[in-house]
Amino acid sequence: MRRRLRAWAAIVLAGCASWFGSARAAVDYWAWHPNVHLARILDDAGRLYLFEGELLVRGGDTLFQRRGFPPPTASPHPVVLVYRLEAMEWPEPLQRQVERDLAAFEAKRNQVWGIQIDFDARTRNLDRYGELLGQVRARLPARYRLSVTGLMDWASQGKLEDLNALQGVVDEIVFQAYQGKGPIKDHRRYFERLSVRGLSVPFKLGLVEHGQYDPDAL
């Protein structure tokens, strides 16, 4: 099934994903700002990716800043908790925070799919990033899945062996096909390259809502 990722305007991104060559798009959503009214999500939407906070680097130290959504009660959509990283690190305080968040969402009777890590790893550092993700996966209870966002440069320039090494570590990569409020430049070229690369790890495309994408490229 092809999925499209939508994004809500400037403050909020609604996320979705896509497989090449399918007939109809199912829609998942990213929500990056707690002021978003989740009620606007379609009844037949798929997963709901909720931003919960970020690991910041300040003065050489890392600290976690909570910016996220409080747990809804019995969401009809499976939820994914999203954490943004400014550094390629997964410190113990963040691990404990993630564990608390997962427990809090489940206590509200939500179906928690897992977590997503949003980190713009440089393409040449994909192998090192894969090692960190392996450590995160090892500490994540088996019932939860692990998603990561990815740069479109990964798709076109990353070593295929580094990307495919993520199979069994992550359950999906969501490639970010946008810049700011619009589609990424030369998105058709990126999509064509991605479609023939032979990735073994499941992937999706993150598209900005109302973005002027080339329909033939999707």
Place the predicted regions along the sequence by residue:
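Secreted glycan hydrolases and related glycan-binding modules that recognize and/or cleave
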Residues: 2-218
